[in-house]
Swiss-Prot record:
Gene from which this protein is expressed: ribH
Keyword annotations of the record: Riboflavin biosynthesis, Transferase
Any one GO MF annotation of this record: 6,7-dimethyl-8-ribityllumazine synthase activity
Pfam families to which the protein is assigned, alphabetical: DMRL_synthase
Family that this chain belongs to: Belongs to the DMRL synthase family.
Protein name (record): 6,7-dimethyl-8-ribityllumazine synthase
InterPro entries: LS (IPR034964), LS/RS (IPR002180), LS/RS_sf (IPR036467)
Protein species of origin: Novosphingobium aromaticivorans (strain ATCC 700278 / DSM 12444 / CCUG 56034 / CIP 105152 / NBRC 16084 / F199)
EC numbers: 2.5.1.78
Function statement: Catalyzes the formation of 6,7-dimethyl-8-ribityllumazine by condensation of 5-amino-6-(D-ribitylamino)uracil with 3,4-dihydroxy-2-butanone 4-phosphate. This is the penultimate step in the biosynthesis of riboflavin.
Length: 139
């Protein structure tokens, strides 16, 4: 049994609840332990994962958040930099599933977050599981 940390940026509570539910369900169904922490925003997710990984308490991570395009350039910065930070950690061997939605509107987010529809939280958890399996295979 592995231990996973879900790191969520809570901004849209109802959407986050669905994403976290999907991720938890996938991890628990696979027989793993799950903990959840909250950070202020998507930009803080990679940093929180890096700090948690130093503790060696967790085997893998799931990043959860929702970034909806607004009227300013902020969307591009948050979407790009959070993904870049997660990818940098992944390239260093950290097993992370990226469940940060980057969408045009709330309707798109709802379809992707809902475990009964696209279940992107569950998909992110399964990606983390797959990366953990690869890391264990090649370690």
């Amino acid at each position: 049994m592995a231990k996973f940390l879900i790191v969520e940026a809570r901004f849209y509570d109802h959407l986050n609840d669905m994403l976290v539910a999907g991720a938890k369900a996938a991890l628990k169904e696979a027989g793993h332990e799950v903990e959840v922490i909250t950070v202020p925003g998507a930009l803080e997710i990679p940093g929180a994962i890096a700090l948690a990984d130093q503790s060696e308490d967790y085997d893998g991570y799931v990043a959860i958040g929702v970034v909806i395009r607004g009227e300013t350039y902020h969307f591009e910065i948050v979407a790009g930099e959070s993904a870049r930070g997660i990818m940098a950690l992944t390239m260093d061997g950290v097993a992370i599933g990226n469940g940060i939605l980057t969408v045009e509107n709330e309707a798109q987010a709802l379809v992707r977050a809902d475990p009964k529809q696209k279940d992107k939280g569950g998909e992110a958890a399964k990606a983390a599981l797959a990366l953990l399996a690869l890391r264990e295979r090649w370690s």
